[in-house]
Amino acid sequence: MDFGISTMPLEDYQLKSKLTLLKELGIKYLEVKPKEGHFNYYDPKYLDEMSKEFKGNGIKIVSMHMPTNGVDISLIEEYDRIWSVREVEKTALALLRLEGEILVVHPGSEIKDEKTRSVQREKSEQSLEEILKFCEQWGIKIALENTLPGKTGDSISEILEIVKKFNSKNLGICLDTGHCNITSSINNHSGVVKCLPEIKNFLCHLHVHDNSGKSDDHYLPFEGNIDWKGFVEGLKEINYQGVFMFELRKKTNNEEILRTVKESYYNLIA
């Protein structure tokens, strides 16, 4: 099992300017966060240039996150929903250009009124069907991520239900450890260790970060209360074959946090 990082801690910088640092630190696998001023996913020439830069620095793009600039595939207003679907599809094409494999998708954002939960779930599935059809023709796999409480897909059981409904080899689950820890703490749902056997046949990607079960802190492992020993043992038991992808909150000292990531990973798997 290899480790990688989401570029989230670097999102305030042009990603190109940090590739030398990543190479020096031996970080070979990335999940790209598409954000203007950080990584311009909508510019084909830029993507081709970055593809060369990644290869030149020995870096492989494993995954890309869907945009978070207002994109929400569960929106009820059809104009906004379709716009969101198209933005996600643009990131799929960007990922394809970088020879990446996994597109991380949130099933939806905040549910303002519980009465609309079922409607938003329906819209989310409608959008997901369209995105999945688009991605299947390019061989890109969608990893549906469990979200924070109060959002569409805020439980492992709901994520699992959606994935099983589509029954597609191009749709799997991205387990976000931090989100799962909060949901299990607040709503008494399955925690990060307990849920692994439930999702083992669909788990294709990870977002690894820690918290104390109250807020989405995106800490390094062992800075919160997640049972990391049990989690790593659980991954081995289900024979997880994906990348151990850290998703940490941005820090002021990027080099320090990136060095710590590597140390943290080797401490976890030792």
Specify the residue positions occupied by each region the protein language model found:
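N-terminal pre-domain/capping segments
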Residues: 1-100, 172, 190, 201, ...
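Histidine-acidic metal/acid-base catalytic patches
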Residues: 1-4, 12-26, 84, 155-270
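Active-site acidic/histidine proton-transfer and metal-coordination neighborhood
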Residues: 14-17, 56, 73-173
